Amino acid sequence: MYKRQGNGSTNAITLDGDENMQPDWVWVKDRGRAGYNHNSYDSVRGATKLIWQNLTNAENTYADSLTSFNSDGFTLGADSSNGEVNVNTQSYVAWNWKESATAGFDIVTFTGSGGTQNISHSLSAKPEWIITKSRSASGAWYTYHGANTAAPETDFLKLNDTDATADNATVWNDTAPTTSVFTVGSAFDNTTTYI
C-alpha cells in the first residue's frame, strides 16, 4: 500500500521496502473526497486502461491517468480527464500487486462464449479468490472466494454491489476451480472480453 498526495502533473511513484517491484495491478482511491471511484489498472490490459471497481462501466482509456508501469512503481499523468488519481493536493492510497504464481496472483483475459468455458490460469494451485469484469461492455464484477460458503463454486458476490452472496449456476457453472482452470457459465456473454 502506498499513500501519497497528488500533484496534478506527471508523478513517478516509486515503491520501496516490501513493495519494491513493478506492480501488475494498481488500485487507486481518493482518501479525502467522498463520491470518487475505485480506479483499477493492470499491466495485462496496459497503462491508461481504467476500470472502476465500484461501477459496472466498461473499460475506458485515459491517456493522462496511470501512464506507465515501471520497474520500481508506476507513473501518473496530470489526470485532467479522469480527475480521480492525481489531483493537486488531494490524498490518495494505492494498493499494488505483482503477478506471480509464487505469490498466488495471476491476471488473465478471455472472450466470453455465452456458455460453459474453462479459463486457463498459471497459478499451479487452486485459486482461492477470483474477480472477473467485462472490459468491452458494462457488467458486474463477479467474485468467487473459496471460503465464501460451504460450496463456493455454486455462489458469487459482486465487487460493485453490497448484496449478499447469491446462488446462480450461470456464473461459475457450479464447478470448482482447479490447479489449471476456473470455469465460467452463460453469465459471461458471447464475444464480450473479460479480465
Give the ranges of each region predicted by the language model.
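Surface-exposed molecular-recognition determinants
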Residues: 3-195
